[in-house]
Amino acid sequence: MNTRYFTSRLLALMLAALLVFSCAAAEETEIPSGVVDNFVQSEIEKQQSASDATAFEAGAAAGEYYADFTFGGVQTLSGITTTLSLYANLPKYAKPVSAVLRLSYTASDLILTDISSLTYYMNGTPFGSSKIVARSDGAQTVLYVSVPVELLTTGYNLLEILSYVRLTDDEGCRDDYNGANWVKIADTTCLRIYYEISDDADELYMYPYPFISLMNPDGAESVVAVSDAADEAELTAAMMLMAGMGNSLSAENAMTLCRLSDAKSENVLYVGLKKNTPEYLLSLLTQSVPATGALVQRATDGDTSYLLIVAEEEAALSEAAALLSDTSRVAQLHTSQTYVSVGEAQQYALASETSGLTLAGQYTIKDI
């Protein structure tokens, strides 16, 4: 009897000890470091992305000016670190007010998502980062990331996407030689920039706006027109004007050359002698056409924007076309109209050449 009692007592004590140990172990077990933070960060990213998605679409729906810049196709990031670059050119007339990156991608499901990320830079400054999402079903992940507008500048802007992708969490370079650490950026990815038109967009230094613009990159919505009684000089100047705009086109030239009566467009570049120019166009001029040289003026009539080149003498028309084809001279025209003299282009070229020779001929005592 005593032996059975002792045995029962021993088993009870062992069971109690086991329960106490289990409870203590449960109390001391900690949530793995970073799990809560990762969850909270994921929720924050989802909320921010949803807000940026609204910003991405709302402006377009409201009829605001915007431009989309894309990679033009699927891009693949592979290796531990890779950088993908996208250039966005903002002309002088476009004042950026907001920008959103829509990023669509798929990623290898072998990626360690807790330590793999995408970081975003604009003109060398980081503005955001997000963990890479790898879906086993191959579905795309779509993110919307707001770009601080103060990072944008007139001219070329460089957007960079830096990927950091790991398959193993140990030190070493094995990931560099593994083809499974990839992220594919979809062709639906784009940088959307909303902008306003500058208050001085009607000044000549903004040329070739609005005849070529972010909204009209190939010139399809613009025409170069000559008078219905056009002679060879007018046609020559008009073709020079079209050729000069070629460098400003971001797509194949779709601009047309036509007679004024056939100009069915809201953007008209007109080249004509005064004697062949209809009165309704002459009435838009705020300055008189000179006896020598040409008058170049921006004007509007209702919904139509004009660039009018009018002259008394034939040679002046080609002179005006040469002026507008020279970006360095156009950049100095902070006015809506200007006069051009015959021979001005040659004088400018000689002055530039002489200036270059003078600079080239400058020596210091040290050089000698």
Predicted regions and their residues:
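Generic cytosolic/nucleocytoplasmic N-terminal low-complexity/intrinsically disordered segments
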Residues: 1-2, 45
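Bacterial N-terminal signal peptides that target proteins for export
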Residues: 2-11
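Short, low-complexity disordered leader/linker segments with a strong preference
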Residues: 11-12, 26-27
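Solvent-exposed alpha-helical segments and adjacent loops
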Residues: 27-368
